[in-house]
């Protein structure tokens, strides 16, 4: 399913009829402007695959299994090939100690293909094996509200799932000890990035539910100390603030999201101008 931006309508001189597109920008657009997707490296240590492989080797992992995983791990540029190698590995070695990592990394490959059904299936497979995988929790919880369809009969349940994922991700991060070999600064930076992603996702979940006050609270947390926030976060925050009749703040958010080259540049510019007029009339 290929997603595209829907157009937002603007009232002539009345209240702005701003809307987040019913579907978010296509994944190719999202990844150009988003700080969050895809999964980068396992929270807790770098090169998680190699670390787990070393542990598996100590347990006497079969050489063929090791080679199959290395082929999957080393495939960086071709998502179709990575999917093929990953699925072949899972079919042949379903009980492998490396299975969770394969599922987790298949999430990225399926995201590149905009194959949301298999993104969800791979994420669910990874979380069944490792419920505290922060990377998968944060990524799944972030993706769900971005590809949400208002007419999906399972939409409400999916938003509930996204909320649970992000809340659990933050719970895990709060109790996670700093791993050996990672500096305090590095660990703090990754935790901050994941926490920001979680608040971003929750902001969009609450927006989809039309709970604009809670959405604004989450997205304002995202903006704190953030010099280069995600443009979709800024857009949604602008709509939240508009709905809450905080017009000048809404205009500021729309101005910030009108970054050159952004998929939301034109919409944000138009909305900023319209809301400025509304702010002036409300004084």
Regions found by a protein language model. Name each.
Residues 92-99, 128-134, 174-193, 224-230, ...:
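Short solvent-exposed coil/turn linkers within tandem alpha-helical repeat scaffolds
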Residues 108, 142, 146-149, 204, ...:
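Residue-level recognition of tetratricopeptide repeat
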Residues 26-101:
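N-terminal leader/linker segments that initiate helical-solenoid repeat arrays
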Residues 72-76, 110-114, 141-155, 210, ...:
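Short coil/turn linking the two alpha-helices of tandem helical-hairpin repeats
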Residues 33-36, 179-180, 192-208, 217, ...:
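Terminal, low-structured helical/coil segments at or just beyond the last alpha-helical repeat
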Residues 68-71, 106, 140, 202, ...:
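Structural register within alpha-helical repeat arrays
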């Amino acid at each position: 399913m290929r997603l595209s931006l829907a157009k937002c309508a603007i009232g002539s001189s009345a209240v702005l009829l701003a809307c987040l597109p019913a579907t978010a920008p296509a994944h190719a657009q999202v990844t150009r402007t988003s700080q969050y997707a895809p999964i980068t490296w396992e929270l807790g240590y770098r090169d998680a695959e190699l670390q787990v492989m070393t542990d598996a080797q100590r347990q006497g992992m079969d050489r063929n299994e090791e080679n199959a995983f290395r082929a999957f791990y080393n495939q960086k540029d071709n998502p179709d090939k990575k999917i093929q190698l990953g699925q072949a590995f899972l079919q042949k070695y379903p009980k492998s100690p490396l299975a969770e990592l394969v599922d987790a990394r298949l999430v990225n490959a399926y995201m590149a293909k905009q194959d949301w059904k298999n993104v969800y299936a791979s994420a669910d497979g990874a979380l069944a094996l490792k419920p505290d995988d922060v990377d998968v929790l944060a990524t799944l919880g972030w993706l769900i509200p971005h590809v949400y369809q208002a007419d999906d009969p399972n939409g409400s349940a999916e938003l509930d799932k996204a909320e649970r994922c992000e809340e659990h991700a933050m719970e895990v991060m709060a109790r996670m000890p700093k791993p050996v070999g990672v500096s305090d600064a590095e660990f703090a930076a990754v935790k901050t990035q994941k926490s920001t992603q979680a608040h971003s996702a929750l902001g969009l979940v609450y927006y989809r539910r039309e709970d604009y006050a809670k959405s604004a609270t989450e997205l304002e947390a995202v903006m704190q100390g953030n010099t280069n926030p995600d443009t979709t976060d800024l857009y949604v925050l602008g709509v939240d603030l508009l709905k809450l009749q905080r017009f000048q703040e809404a205009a500021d958010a729309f101005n910030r999201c009108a970054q050159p080259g952004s998929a939301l540049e034109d919409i944000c510019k138009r909305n900023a101008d319209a809301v400025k007029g509304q702010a002036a009339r409300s004084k």
